[in-house]
Amino acid sequence: CRLGAMSVTVADVVAALEAAYPPQLAESWDKVGLICGDPDDGVSRVAFALDCTLEVAQAAVESQAQMLVVHHPLLLRGVSSVAVDTPKGKVIHTLLKGGVALFAAHTNADSARPGVSDKLAELVGITPGRPIKPVHLDGIDKWGVHIPPADVERVMAALFELGAGEIGTVSYTHLR
């Protein structure tokens, strides 16, 4: 999105969603990301839903949304055709004819911090913990930090308290 121009594109929305819910956090079987639509199309209205059913797609078109963000992917498995005479094909064609791009954030949104699982935990009064299956993303899971010798123990204790230094079931890992 260019500042001052107010022209947000599908690609801009995708970039923001992928920054919050990195695709690398998705399970290997999951199908997340932009499902249909032109990344260069403009977006001024975004609709959100749990699932992209035909009714949801029609509502997104009727509301003049240019993008629909869902949790559950429409094309998760078993789809060999998106012809208009198939159930999922009818949904895709409805969106495309209505100028609505479709994006899914599923297990990546579940695993992100904060993410869907954190919010659900909060709603039932549970303090969110850590992911059941931590995923380490390239570029953000290794740190090189120079600390004055007098402060090493205090800084390391604070980092470990926040979960740094965990590899699988082993905690407090570090190199000096």
How should each PLM-predicted stretch be described?
Residues 3-176:
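Hydrophobic structural segments
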